[in-house]
């Protein structure tokens, strides 16, 4: 369909639907926010508090061990987010990684074996941390979300906001399913 990514495709559909009903929207790209460094401070904060971040995440997700680092560097060789973070340098805002692969949805995604260094702008936070990070970066004070997020995603986001970022989460609004 001519879009560069899955996200770009669905963003275009949303923008088109909003335009059809006369709702003005401002579309922001997380990729661009990371690339411009707008997430640098929150990435540094999560990585600085990674022991606390691990403890909070373990309340919601199995398999969080003492080696878990809440950042996914994009491999410079294969461009995948299949890396294990080996070290963090908060001063230079970089991580050292190895592209080892990961398991997702019961499937193994192979890594290419490359080892390298990435800046905080060359990766992303895992989604459970990224959502509350967006609240901080974008100054979100009201957050609507589908009912499917009310029992898992939202409670973990609240917990991370309060106990990792030390902010109050936005006012929530749960909605039913809707179609555009």
Residue ranges of predicted features:
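Alpha-helical recognition segments enriched in aromatics with Gly/Pro capping
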Residues: 49-52, 59-180
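N-terminal Rossmann-like or analogous alpha/beta NTP/dinucleotide-binding catalytic cores
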Residues: 1-54, 64, 156-159
